[in-house]
Each structure stands twice: as C-alpha cells, then as structure tokens.
Amino acid sequence: PGVVNFVPGNPRMIVDPCLENPDFAGVHFTGSTRVFQGLWGKIAESLPRLRSYPRIVGETGGKDFIVAHHDCDRRGLLIALLRGSFEYQGQKCSAASRAYIPESVWEGIKGEFVEEIQKITMGDPRDFTNFVTAVIDQKAFDKISGYIRAAEEDPLCDVVVGGGCDDSKGWFI
C-alpha cells in the first residue's frame, strides 16, 4: 500500500501477488542471478496487465569491496574490514570480499586488524556470544576453503591470520 515497501520472504509467495497488481511500478532485488533472471521473465509476461513499465534493479551474485584513501579514518576502515568480512560469515551480498588499501595505511592497521580477528568468537549459532558460526552448507565450505588454499599456495599472497577450515562438526571457516 505504501510508496516503497520492503518485502522480505519467499519469492514465490511475494512475486505473483505483486505482479497481479496493475500498479506494480518496480522492484529492487538482491539475491541470486538465476532467481533474478526468472523474475525478469515473470515481469515481462505481466507487462500487458501493468499500467506502466516497471523499474527493475538487481544486485546479483556479487560482493562489495572496500577502497581506502591514504588519509582515511583508520579506525573506521578497521571496523569496515572486520564487519564487512566476518559478519554473517561473509555470506551476504554486502560482504567485503576484497579491499584496496594503500600500503602505508595497511602497515599502520595490520597489527590491530590481526589482533581484532583473533578476538572474534566462533561456534554454535545458538550461543549469541559467538560472532561467527559455520557457513551455510558443504558447497559453500568447499568453495571458501578452496579460495583460502589458493591464497596459501600463491607466492604473491600473504595469509596474515587464520586460514584454518574444519568441517568435522559443521562447516567452519
């Protein structure tokens, strides 16, 4: 009923009722590329019933990056790196999967960054003192641990902290 509505949930339960409304004016979707492609198709099929062409925006299959300037707020950068990389185990579309940081800035925060990572608690998601828990499934575990192994084997990369992966009791990275 409003001008802008945030509607999280099962896409199958949301999309059809929205597209049945002739006033449907647009969607900003965040999720998988495959689901977004299906959504495009459904919208195209609905065009004859709609009063106007809806605006369609999709953020699919990507993750964010962090760019730091040489005179950035270093504490703010440190927090952005930590939260962007580790909240929700890095499994969200806004997760920071890479960072572009001047060497002079990196050398100034590297030690504190490592210290802060070592303070992060990991374990059972039912224990709310844990900041990080297991990744979603075996496929995600295999993919992420593969990236870590590739970094460890690449002579141009330095893994400065962590790198361990354990799937004996959940998919922990």
Where are these regions (language model features)?
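PLP-dependent aminotransferase-like
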Residues: 1-15, 47
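ALDH superfamily catalytic-core signature
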Residues: 20-22, 26, 32-173
